[in-house]
Amino acid sequence: MEEMKPCAANSPPLTPIGFLERAATVYGDCTSIVYGSNTVYTWRETNLRCLRVASSLSSIGIGRSDVVSVLSPNTPAMYELQFAVPMSGAILNNINTRLDARTVSVLLRHCESKLLFVDVFSVDLAVEAVSMMTTDPPILVVIADKEEEGGVADVADLSKFSYTYDDLIERGDPGFKWIRPESEWDPVVLNYTSGTTSAPKGVVHCHRGIFVMSVDSLIDWAVPKNPVYLWTLPIFHSNGWTNPWGIAAVGGTNVCLRKFDAPLIYRLIRDHGVTHMCGAPVVLNMLSATQESQPLNHPVNILTAGSPPPATVLLRAESIGFVISHGYGLTETAGVIVSCAWKPKWNHLPASDRARLKARQGVRTVGFTEIDVVDPESGLSVERNGETVGEIVMRGSSVMLGYLKDPVGTEKALKNGWFYTGDVGVIHSDGYLEIKDRSKDIIITGGENVSSVEVETVLYTIPAVNEVAVVARPDEFWGETPCAFVSLKNGFSGKPTEEELMEYCRKKMPKYMVPKTVSFMDELPKSSTGKVTKFVLRDIAKKMGDKTIS
């Protein structure tokens, strides 16, 4: 059968962008987006709006290989741009609105962004970030919000902005032929996992990977046609785990949400019949702890990832009516690629046993290829006994192409045919994966990744500081919070207090990165080679118990 080969008829590039075109045909009159009191669109309208924006981008010179950035919460425009930007041929770069101006500036410069869409309430952040750039700044486009008080921007007062989002829609061609990828390996999204000035980690994904991840997520979560999806997960977190494209594929309704508000979420669940939502474990905690947490009148599926929810939170949320699924993924995999596939026989187990099983991350999703845990020295698979730890490695279609402008980092992560996550875990005898420790330099607090190295770098700029190490401290509400262990220089007058160190950090980094605990030590513990033993400090932080500081 040597003559049987791929051809143009059987190998067109896979892309998730085509899901929107199909949704407009199949679900044209169905509701695609709901936001606030008055904003409602159908799938036909959403498709036309996206085509208009893509057309306008093309007309002002945006095209293949250009990076277009977006600084916005989960508004209708943010959802539309997940399609409209790639439709113009450009590469989509969502930026976390919780970052400070300095970090945003670093990311814009690193990716050489050609255009930046800015939510009206992030205008000051964007203008400050652009003012710090030493290279050509991106074209600025402001996105108004008629549903929010003060959300309609007066363009006359925004001299640094070239267009409004509505301008692009009005001037765009609804008959625009969107630009399909020449290859399914063409980049489609760029997401940053870290904003350090020395080495921003920009993760690049291709059309093929996002297509596979989108479909895989629908299958694994058993999402039916016409679901109602509530956007509690920020889209700037790894493109909302590819759900913008997946929900289009099944003709669902996107209930957009500017910011997390537990009472509002319960009202939206009731008013719109929400069936699905995602978020970090802190979302479960906030929903189950609020006074509004009355039993739901219908089940709501929640997918959470990262550190497992505490058993008490899990049981409380389930008693309200939430059906909880737990998984594991990274920015480098574009979404959840390991899920705790639930077995019916486990339903009859005691609550404590169910919580223990749900705390495990699970098995690979059906569309992913392989997951393993290997010995870091030999590279061989560890014994599947739930006790022998090793590094989690994986391979599958949704693994990133690599890190932007970082060939060394890419080569280190993608080697021997595997993606090396840096996370530590075990595999149980039944084949289920359980994480024992996230990547040693990453702290996950309220769903946000914090680079301990970046926090340490800031603390080292304080003249009185001799040594510093930042680790995760367990927190029942946030999951983890940064905990800084500090030794001060001998003979240094005016030694800083715990609060003074925290205040210094608040001026240098986003609020979520600031250490919530500072512990002074005469000397940090070290190995025989003189390296700080962070595992000792993690154990100390764990024994401190939970602590929450808002």
Swiss-Prot record:
GO terms under biological process: fatty acid metabolic process
PROSITE patterns linked to this entry: AMP_BINDING
Any GO MF annotation of the entry: ligase activity
Gene3D superfamilies per record: 3.30.300.30, N-terminal domain of ligase-like
EC number(s) reported in the record: 6.2.1.-
Enzyme class, first EC level, given as a word: ligase
Pfam families for this protein: AMP-binding, AMP-binding_C
Tissue specificity field: Expressed at low levels in roots, leaves, stems and developing seeds.
Top-level taxon: Eukaryota
Keywords, sorted A to Z: Fatty acid metabolism, Ligase, Lipid metabolism
Similarity remark: Belongs to the ATP-dependent AMP-binding enzyme family.
Entry function: May act as an acid--thiol ligase that activates carboxylic acids by forming acyl-CoAs.
NCBIfam families reported for this sequence: PRK08162.1
Protein name, UniProt field: Probable acyl-activating enzyme 6
Lineage of producing organism: Eukaryota, Viridiplantae, Streptophyta, Embryophyta, Tracheophyta
